[in-house]
């Protein structure tokens, strides 16, 4: 019989046998290991909770993981939109070819009286049917493209968390939890916060241009607060550009009036909500929304610069 190495004398020196009583109750054997195990389990639970929180925050779009995943979604959706746009263009080309052929046949039939009326009528009906089918296909693709663009743009606005703040009278709107810069009170912000807010606005506008298949004139990144006038000018110009393309402002909009009424942050918010911005018109086009004119307005509306 083998004796316990703790409560009895082991017959074999190099074989350590421990009985059930000592395993369950001897502090000299397992108390320390049990304590280490409990501590390890507690640490594992804490790490598990931390990992779950990080994943939940990340997939919600508030962390680095969420931002990368959303960038990937936007990239994939952009590829789909480009392919859809190519299909749309091909359909348009087909419709145009059918129309050209139809017009050519009409011209031939009008100049050559020897063509039989029955044959001419049949060809005309066939061409009209083909043109109608191609036109219906073109309309379907246009609707699909528009629907996908609207859905993707809505996701973009939710991603950047563009909100209207009723608690702050100075900065009425926020982006990614930061105050959205404006001409009227932008100088009151800390320089680092101002630059971060401008960067978020620039990223938002760049992605919006890509979704709506427009091309921005300038992609120069905002790096610091030294070129604050140029930064404001570029952001306002891009915002006006996409607002006009989306028909959310009048084509002959007065840039002075719209900046006084809405400022940059209000224009961005209305864009995110797809709301029309009412303003006075510059019917004579005496002050067109060029970079130079916008820059002069920016300088006049920020006296501290």
Swiss-Prot record:
It is a peripheral membrane protein. Disruption phenotype: Still forms preautophagosomal structures (PAS) in proximity to the vacuolar membrane. It is found in: Preautophagosomal structure membrane; Vacuole membrane. It holds the Pfam family ATG14. Residues 34-147 form a coiled coil. Keywords: Autophagy, Coiled coil, Membrane, Protein transport, Transport, Vacuole. GO terms for cellular component: phagophore assembly site membrane; protein-containing complex; vacuolar membrane. One of its GO terms (biological process) is macroautophagy. Its main location: membrane. Component of the autophagy-specific VPS34 PI3-kinase complex I. Coiled-Coils at the N-terminal half are essential for autophagy. Required for cytoplasm to vacuole transport (Cvt) and autophagy as a part of the autophagy-specific VPS34 PI3-kinase complex I. This complex is essential to recruit the ATG8-phosphatidylinositol conjugate and the ATG12-ATG5 conjugate to the pre-autophagosomal structure. ATG14 mediates the specific binding of the VPS34 PI3-kinase complex I to the preautophagosomal structure (PAS). This is Autophagy-related protein 14. It comes from Kluyveromyces marxianus (strain DMKU3-1042 / BCC 29191 / NBRC 104275) (Yeast). The gene is ATG14.
